[in-house]
């Protein structure tokens, strides 16, 4: 059984200094970290808060994602794909179920579809010129409606490896939208050809 919230906090705070700051880790000192260790400080570790704040869309009647089920760049009967604007990496796409599900609520059939769709999207993103890898993330702490992130890592940018990619994305200047739109169209055309679906909602 996982540590209770108070046990976890006590375990973590035992490694912190008098200001509740944990030491810098092997990741923050690594060569792919966006931050130089000199002068870098860890934020104080705050005590746990229970109950946790409700996520957006916990009530399906007030779910933003459900209200946008007809918006996107690709659709089939059960899934939709959107492009996230204003990012720093070449392309960020998001896959959503059109109906209200979180990951643990998916039927086995929908879970199988998610696996196949994820594989097709990774193939098509990685086939884009000048893209080395498609990173895939499911977090879910902010929204109760399942959303899967696909980040395209630019070729040759070895500092953007691993889980730091999302931090680099936040630091980088906004990527040209016209290029991202064109690449998103290439991915969607390939997805329609390999998996099905269409550019327009039903």
Question: What name fits each language-model region?
Answer:
Residues 1-95, 201-202:
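Active-site microenvironments that recognize anionic phosphate/pyrophosphate groups
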Residues 93-117, 171-176:
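Short histidine-centered catalytic/ligand-binding loop motif
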Residues 112-128:
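Active-site helix/loop of acyl-thioester processing domains in fatty-acid/polyketide metabolism
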Residues 84-86, 139, 151:
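Short beta-strand micro-motifs enriched in acidic
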Residues 75-81, 113-117, 141:
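Glycine- and small hydrophobic-enriched segments that form the cores of compact globular domains
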Residues 129-142:
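A short glycine-rich, hydrophobically flanked beta-strand micro-motif that places a catalytic Asp/Glu
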Residues 19-21, 26, 31-39, 154-202:
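C-terminal helix-cap and adjacent tail motif
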Residues 146-153:
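A short beta-strand motif that forms the metal-chelation/ATP-contact edge
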